[in-house]
Every structure is written in C-alpha cells, then in structure tokens.
Amino acid sequence: NGIEQPLFQGREWVTACRKWKEKYPVVLPRHWQEDGLHANAYAFVDYLSTQLPPRTLTVVSNGTCCVAGHQAYVIKEGTRFFNSNAVASMGYGLPAAIGGCVANKRRTTVCLEGDGSIMMNLQELQTIITNALPIKIFLINNEGYHSIRQTQNNLFADHCKVGIGPESGDLSFPDFSKLARVFGYPYFAAHSNKEMQ
C-alpha cells in the first residue's frame, strides 16, 4: 500500500534512543584530557549543566555555544533551553537571556555566549546590572570568530586567514575581565578543565 511502518513503536523509540546515548556519548574521555591551556567546550557544557538546579533557564548564543550546547547540555526536569538554531545569529545570547529572564518572572537564567557574539550586544550588560536581573553569563572565549575560522581552515587551509582572530593579524578582542569590571559584573576565569571544576 506504499505506507511504510515506523522502525519503532511507542516506548521502543525512547528505549532505542537511551541505548544509543549510552553507546555513543557526546562527551568523550578525550574532552576531559587536560592540556592546561583551555577548558574543552563540550566538557564545560556537560559539567555546567549537571551542576545547575532543575528548572534552570539556559540561553545559548551561536557558534561553539550553540554546537556544544545542543550536544552536551544535560536537560533536567523543568529546564528551558533557548537557542537561535535556524539562523545562529551572532549577538542572540544576551538579549534572549534578558527576555527569557523577564518573561519568566526574573527566574535565574544562564547565558552561554561567545567572545565574538557578546561584542554585538555588549551594552546589554548594563541593562542586566541596572535591572538587577539574575543572569549568569558564561563566556566561551576561543579568541575570535571560531566558526569562520573553521570554515577558512577547512576550505582554504593556509591561503586565507581574514577577520578570525589574532592569527589573522587583523582582529583582536578586549580584555573581558576589565570589561566586566567596568559594567560592575563579577568575573571569574577558567582556562583549563581543572580550573573549570
């Protein structure tokens, strides 16, 4: 009759997904290996999400935050996870976190932002401070526009390094610890998986 039967019926699908999740974990032991220089984004998102209480609102911006967030974030009961997946708009995180926090009666909100993305709406830090919004920002600093960096490395190898960060010689970012202090935002840094924990 041309109608295909589904591979799984009812709860079989959930059971199959759980088995695959165990067999093919997103966060692997290599993500936790220490290099002493950088915290791994997948390990970070996994660790952070397991430490957050149930019912946490989490907003992820674009790039690494979005990719690692979608794959490694552990969803708990009542958790809300907001993203801009379809267009991955730079600068989405801060205003979306503000909107999510206010719309949910000032519920504690976590915002995962990238160093490039936060620069698009940096002024919103003052909105958060002025309104005493309970928003915790976790900045993934990969020293530039990492998604663009990956595209250039994958497609053009060493022939093209433009507008991606220090290695292109035409783009730099501010000292985020100083920026946080200027806005009156507490700042803590973790440069390795060990420091992160």
List the predicted regions and their residue ranges.
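Thiamine diphosphate
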Residues: 1-7, 68, 73-197
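Flexible, glycine/charged-enriched surface loops at secondary-structure junctions
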Residues: 4-20
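Active-site diphosphate/adenylate-binding microenvironment
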Residues: 16-95, 100
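Generic low-complexity, intrinsically disordered sequence content enriched
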Residues: 11-12, 32, 183
